[in-house]
């Protein structure tokens, strides 16, 4: 007798072993038809999986979150079958489900083309229509290596021989005549794959991610449970493309990058204004929350990086140089320099907490393939700060930091923030007692600020637990920016200490913290979040003043000058172009306000105001306009 317990608590007895599909059929024909997989005691399995002992079972349908990975994994297999049917001799390697889709890597001498993708997608449709049963088989390692070897599938032989652990059961999934090595699980048949997939792009990929190995051809695709979901995803991609910071940065003349300085940014005047506004704002927040700003050297001797542990653990990502028989490294992080400032004087417990902040310019030797506009660079600036405090001060310091962070994010237009608390890993420094106190302090600080959080057990760094803050932008994309990290290790390595109340020397707790993260990346996020429509306080040009004809040129100049004297970033267009052309051109620059002056405005000593989005605000006197603009800037709307 086998007893199966369902999610609603009901129990179904069976005389002997039973498959997931049979349980679904016993519940109802509708569920049997909708079943894509099962969860047996929490483990995702095929519908053909045999339950031979009492178990808990949930039937997985297209409505369940777990179904999406199954659908994407099956789409990858169907694509691989389509490729091998259309292009015999092509070798398949690996093809997993990934976020928003799937990919498969192929070994083929002739490169795939965009036209090939259309053919492959059409063949995938045909394979789905065939409704081929998908069956799981277990083969011996020797049998599998011989079969794939005879087929010329050298990559599969290597996977079986080197990647799959020797003691692991070797499963093969077969759909029609096509089969592949795979752990599964999979859908019951190709016909269960929703026709809501699309092949997206081609890329190169080294075998097993090693540049010493052969270059393979990767085909990316996306797959969803419903066509409506696919269409919504494609729409989001279109929106993301319109908002791409690389395109908008060029359109708005903010910055550029070039091959002579890979991963480094050339900031143009307009882009640098945005940078300066953000830096000035953060500097105000440093003062408001009791931080002291410092500056540390960009290049330090190898001995410093050896003491901090960076030379041993991070050297491949550091730019190094030598001079006068000494080795140096360009700093990849600011923390060792801040410890040196702390160590430069004797500190009492009364001096703590000590908060040191820096717009620290760092460089990391990121692989060229990982660089992406200003989102992933080699030279970047962090809004970095380190708090030196006593254990009993940690909770309050973290709580105050969270208040500061929430205010900053809200002012930049981000109100949806996800929080993760990562706790002790197996390998760590520090006592269990210290970790207990630290983790409790972080959790308490979050609760004090009314923040819910996802607990990530074992995901903390070896030197301390951390909180990560992730922003959700207008398109629903997630960007991890803020962090606060306890460090039990670096103060010890670099000899930081303070005089305690009992006159003994003690080691401070060090809190690493950032809100924006990399300034470059944060500006990239801002550009995409606002689609280049910077709020007034950040806009490089806040107001454009335009005359209709030469008669109003002097008045237009006087208006622009008055705005500048009032602290408004105003520009002037006195060109001979028609006013509609001027308005259209400056609208493409996404300016917050455009002021038009004609004869009527000049005579009445007013301006005609157009707000972004083609909003006609009518005529305003200059004093009223300046008051409005100043209020909007101060409110950071």
UniProtKB/Swiss-Prot annotation:
Subcellular location per the Swiss-Prot or TrEMBL entry: Cytoplasm
Principal location listed in the UniProt entry: cytoplasm
Record EC number: 6.1.1.3
Protein name: Threonine--tRNA ligase
Cofactor(s) recorded in Swiss-Prot or TrEMBL: Zn(2+)
Lineage: Bacteria, Pseudomonadati, Pseudomonadota, Betaproteobacteria, Nitrosomonadales
Role of this protein: Catalyzes the attachment of threonine to tRNA(Thr) in a two-step reaction: L-threonine is first activated by ATP to form Thr-AMP and then transferred to the acceptor end of tRNA(Thr). Also edits incorrectly charged L-seryl-tRNA(Thr).
Stretches for region Catalytic: 244-535
Organism: Thiobacillus denitrificans (strain ATCC 25259 / T1)
Entry-linked InterPro entries: aa-tRNA-synt_IIb, aa-tRNA-synth_II, aa-tRNA-synth_II/BPL/LPL, Anticodon-bd, Anticodon-bd_dom_sf, Beta-grasp_dom_sf, TGS, TGS-like
Span of domain TGS: 1-61
Chain's gene name: thrS
NCBIfam families: thrS
Catalytic activity: tRNA(Thr) + L-threonine + ATP = L-threonyl-tRNA(Thr) + AMP + diphosphate + H(+)
Cofactor: record remark: Binds 1 zinc ion per subunit.
Cross-referenced SUPFAM superfamilies: Class II aaRS ABD-related (SSF52954), Class II aaRS and biotin synthetases (SSF55681), TGS-like (SSF81271), ThrRS/AlaRS common domain (SSF55186)
GO cellular component, one term: cytosol
């Amino acid at each position: 007798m086998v007893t199966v317990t369902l999610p609603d608590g009901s129990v179904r007895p069976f005389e002997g072993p039973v498959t997931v599909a049979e349980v679904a059929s016993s519940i109802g024909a509708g569920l049997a038809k909708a079943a894509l997989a099962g969860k047996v005691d929490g483990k995702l399995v095929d519908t053909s999986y045999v339950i031979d002992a009492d178990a808990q079972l949930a039937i997985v349908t297209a409505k369940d979150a777990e179904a999406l990975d199954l659908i994407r994994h099956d789409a990858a297999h169907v694509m691989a079958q389509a490729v091998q049917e259309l292009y015999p001799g092509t070798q398949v390697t690996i093809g997993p489900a990934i976020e928003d889709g799937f990919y498969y890597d192929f070994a083929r001498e002739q490169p795939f083309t965009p036209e090939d993708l259309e053919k492959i997608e059409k063949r995938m449709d045909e394979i789905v229509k065939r409704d081929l049963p998908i069956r799981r088989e277990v083969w011996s390692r020797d049998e599998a290596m011989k079969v794939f070897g005879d087929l010329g599938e050298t990559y599969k032989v290597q996977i079986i021989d080197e990647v799959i652990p020797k003691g692991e059961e070797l499963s093969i999934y077969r759909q029609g005549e096509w089969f592949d090595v795979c752990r599964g699980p999979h859908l019951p048949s190709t016909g269960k794959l929703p026709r809501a997939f699309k092949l997206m792009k081609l890329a190169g990929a080294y075998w097993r991610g090693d540049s010493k190995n052969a270059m393979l051809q990767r085909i990316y695709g996306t797959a969803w449970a419903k066509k409506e979901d696919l269409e919504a995803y494609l729409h989001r991609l279109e929106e993301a493309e319109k908002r791409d910071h690389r395109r908008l940065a060029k359109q708005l003349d903010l910055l550029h990058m070039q091959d002579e300085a890979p991963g480094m940014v050339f900031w143009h005047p307009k882009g640098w204004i945005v940078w300066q506004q953000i830096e000035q704002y953060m500097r105000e927040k440093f003062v408001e929350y009791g931080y002291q700003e410092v500056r540390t050297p960009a290049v330090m001797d190898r001995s410093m990086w050896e003491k901090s542990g960076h030379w041993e653990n991070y050297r491949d990502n550091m730019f190094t140089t030598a001079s006068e028989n000494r080795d140096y490294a360009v700093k990849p992080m600011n923390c060792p320099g801040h410890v040196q400032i702390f160590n430069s004087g004797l500190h009492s417990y009364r001096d703590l907490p000590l908060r040191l902040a820096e717009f620290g310019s760092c460089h990391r030797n990121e692989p060229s393939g990982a660089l992406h506009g200003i989102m992933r660079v080699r030279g970047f600036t962090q809004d970095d700060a380190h708090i030196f405090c006593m254990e009993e001060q940690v909770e309050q310091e973290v709580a105050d930091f969270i208040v500061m962070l929430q205010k900053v994010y809200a002012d930049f237009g981000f109100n949806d923030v996800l929080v993760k608390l990562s706790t002790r890993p197996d390998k760590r420094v520090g006592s269990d007692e210290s970790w207990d106190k630290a983790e409790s302090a972080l959790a308490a600080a979050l609760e004090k600020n009314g923040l819910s959080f996802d607990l990530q057990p074992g995901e903390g760094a070896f030197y301390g637990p951390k909180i990560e803050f992730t922003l959700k932008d207008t398109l629903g994309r997630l960007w991890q920016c803020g962090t606060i990290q306890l460090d039990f290790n670096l103060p010890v390595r670099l000899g930081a200490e303070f005089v305690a109340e009992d006159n003994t020397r003690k080691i401070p707790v060090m809190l690493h913290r950032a809100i924006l993260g990399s300034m470059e990346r944060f500006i990239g996020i801002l550009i995409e979040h606002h689609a280049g429509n910077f709020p007034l306080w950040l806009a490089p040009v806040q107001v454009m003043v335009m005359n209709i004809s030469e008669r109003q040129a002097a008045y237009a100049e006087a208006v622009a000058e008055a705005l500048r004297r009032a602290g408004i970033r105003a520009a002037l267009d006195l060109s001979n172009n028609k006013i509609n052309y001027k308005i259209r051109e400056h609208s493409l620059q996404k300016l917050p306000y455009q002021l038009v002056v004609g004869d009527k405005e000049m005579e009445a000593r007013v301006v005609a105001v157009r707000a972004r989005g083609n909003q006609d605000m009518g005529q305003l006197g200059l004093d009223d306009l300046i008051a409005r603009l100043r209020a909007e800037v101060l409110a950071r709307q």
